[in-house]
Amino acid sequence: MARMRRKNQEESEDFSTVASKVKADVSEGCQDCSIAEYFKVKSSRDIKWSHATNSSYALAKALSSKCHMIEGDILMGVCSSYPTTVAIMAHPPNTVSDLSFEDFILSIHNENNSINDTAEKKGVKLDFKDPEAVLCCLKFLKSISFDAPVFVNADIWDGNGGSGCTFVAKDFFSAVKSYAPNSVLSVGWKVGKTYKLLLKCGGYTWEQVER
């Protein structure tokens, strides 16, 4: 038991080191400019979102709207425009989409480049559902020098009623630090699939919070 506690403590310290470095880079990259200031609104509560933007139709609708941030789910799957498995915009259990991640982010990037006023540009929230998609997507994001606000999200720990989390927290943070150091981190727990299951399992434990 003591050996297990020492191992968990070492993993926690290693994770905390990586996380603190990411946090420092994020703060430096933001240059004291909040998302509200970027979009020229009074507070973050005034930010308008397009959620589950996982199809070409949904993306076109979001780009023509007055939303500030476009959120989409990302996993490895099949896209009609590509002959092999690629990162696509889809929410599990779906593994097929008409919109790849590259087309998703390029469409937003190109639209932003045609706009001078940052208040009219679009930021993105990348909601990763598959750890295999993280590295290739963040590398591509860096390669095009995407310069609007980016939130990076994933459930990287087993949480309330959840199990079998496929993300490795340290690897996720390392990828963000390397390829999207100025992004805003939005991480969480993989929880149970139903409300009844969540109630049955009770609240989060202190061990989960301290991780």
Residue ranges: model-predicted function:
Residues 1-211:
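Phosphate-group recognition and catalysis centered on beta-loop-alpha active-site segments
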